[in-house]
UniProtKB/Swiss-Prot annotation:
Any Pfam family matching the protein: tRNA-synt_1b
Location (main, coarse): cytoplasm
A single GO molecular function term of this UniProt record: ATP binding
Listed name of the protein: Tyrosine--tRNA ligase
PANTHER family: TYROSINE--TRNA LIGASE, MITOCHONDRIAL, TYROSYL-TRNA SYNTHETASE
Binding partners and assembly: Homodimer.
Species whose genome carries this gene: Wigglesworthia glossinidia brevipalpis
Biological classification of the source: Bacteria, Pseudomonadati, Pseudomonadota, Gammaproteobacteria, Enterobacterales
Binding-site residues, L-tyrosine: 35, 172, 176
Annotated compartments: Cytoplasm
């Protein structure tokens, strides 16, 4: 039988694991239950969550049973890594609705090309809400080491900088450890999966299971997806645009374009992390790439096609492919009215202008520009094209001939930003 752990290591999908020899042994002996938790702290997962999700899917493909724990309770607390802001606690009023949305996203991905796979989705609110404080502190709290929590890097940093740490934050580690104890006791779970920043929480859970249930259990962490500045890609950091899995928040076209623009040095790492293309095929592609038998765009397209298909399905992928072809590889004179209607449903930016709006107004109102000063700057720098013709007048007003089929105008800003104007009959 294929060595699943070695396959995951070959793909650089494992950061740490607690006991490789025994994990391999138990996976050979039987099909196991393993789990990963996802806290519903927003109304969608983002691409950073794809690594652990697809990790679970790989186990599912080998016949093991993934258990997804939606953190309906732990999301109300947050851990030391989550940045707080004024609206932080306010957002959690929506946790119940967010939990359902995230559950549907997870189902679509885990069941991709395998509707019959076994999958269990639970919400830790169901068992944590039943806890009695005295029983919990007496039966569980006595096994949790505050010494270990204080040794966490994020805690040491906060203490050194004299930052406030609430009891609520400490409780997060206790409750996450309790999840593992509960799941081992009631669902026979043997492995917990988490991002590399969750290592200490996973170890706390393992210790708790060992001490109370007297069972040997394990943990595996996956690498984190980081931003260009090295920080963890997450919804709490708005320095760079977050790529969400919900097409209402990040359109399928934007999602597809994100992967099409993957830097050359990350293409093959991402093919290993995010696709089910075999390692032998990836290595062949890599050889062709370095021998210049295929160009970077061809490799990027394979990556974008595969990930978009997994997350959004084949029909949405086809739509994103067609929109990309129309916008980048066809002359605007070659586009039919049907092509424009297709573009209008593809997920590119759409704006319905008023008849008295000039170019600056439209750039700002369509969110192609942040302000009128910014709009003026991009116009004067020759960065704006209207129906593929450069426009340098800051007071330009749209005329009848700018409205293709008396309905559409395509604005392009720079090399990659588009907005389709759809004119109403005034």
């Amino acid at each position: 039988m294929k060595d699943l752990i070695q396959e995951l290591k070959n793909r650089k999908l494992i950061s740490k694991l607690t006991d490789e020899i025994n994990i391999k042994k138990i996976l050979k002996e039987k099909k196991i239950n393993l789990y990963c938790g996802f806290d519903p702290t927003a109304d969608s997962l983002h691409i950073g969550h794809l690594i652990p999700l697809l990790f679970l899917k790989r186990f599912s493909n080998f016949g093991h049973i993934p258990i997804i724990v939606i953190g309906g309770a732990t999301a109300l607390l947050g851990d030391f890594n989550i940045k707080k802001n004024k609206s932080f606690l306010e957002k959690y009023k929506n946790v119940k609705n967010w939990s359902k949305t995230i559950e549907n996203q997870i189902l679509n991905i885990i069941k991709y090309e395998n509707n019959n796979c076994n999958l269990i989705i639970l919400n830790n609110y169901l068992w944590i809400k039943e806890l009695k404080i005295i029983n919990f502190l007496r039966d569980i709290g006595r096994f949790i080491s505050i010494n270990k929590i204080l040794r966490k890097e994020i805690v040491k940093k906060k203490l050194k900088e004299n930052q406030h740490i609430s009891f609520m934050e400490f409780s997060y580690s206790l409750l996450q450890g309790y999840d593992y104890y509960f799941l081992n006791l009631n669902y026979d779970v043997y492995i917990q999966i988490g991002g590399s920043d969750q290592w200490s929480n996973i170890i706390s859970g393992i210790d708790l299971v060992n001490k109370i249930n007297k069972k040997k259990v394990y943990g595996i962490t996956t690498p984190l997806l980081t931003r260009s500045n090295g920080s963890k890609l997450g919804k709490s950091d708005d320095k760079e645009k977050v790529i969400w899995l919900d097409k209402k928040k990040t359109s399928v076209y934007e999602f597809y374009q994100f992967w099409l623009n993957t830097p050359d040095e990350k293409i093959f790492r991402y093919l290993k992390l995010f696709t089910f293309i075999s390692m032998s095929e990836i290595n062949k592609l890599k050889c062709k790439f370095f021998n210049k038998e295929i160009n970077p765009f061809q490799a990027q397209k394979i990556l974008a096609d595969e990930i978009t298909k997994i997350v959004h399905g084949i029909s949405q992928l086809r739509l994103a492919q067609k929109a990309t072809n129309f916008l980048f590889y066809k002359k605007i004179s070659e586009l039919s009215i049907e092509d424009f209607y297709l573009l209008s449903t593809s997920g590119i930016k759409i704006y319905y202008p008023k008849s008295n709006e000039n170019i600056k107004d439209i750039l700002v109102n369509s969110k192609l520009s942040k302000s009128k000063n910014n709009a003026k700057s991009v116009i004067l720098s020759s960065s704006i094209r209207i129906n593929n013709k450069k426009q340098k007048s800051i007071d330009f007003m749209f005329k009848k001939e700018d409205k293709l089929f008396n309905l559409f105008t395509l604005i392009k800003k720079g090399k990659k930003d588009f907005c389709l104007l759809i004119w109403k009959n005034y």
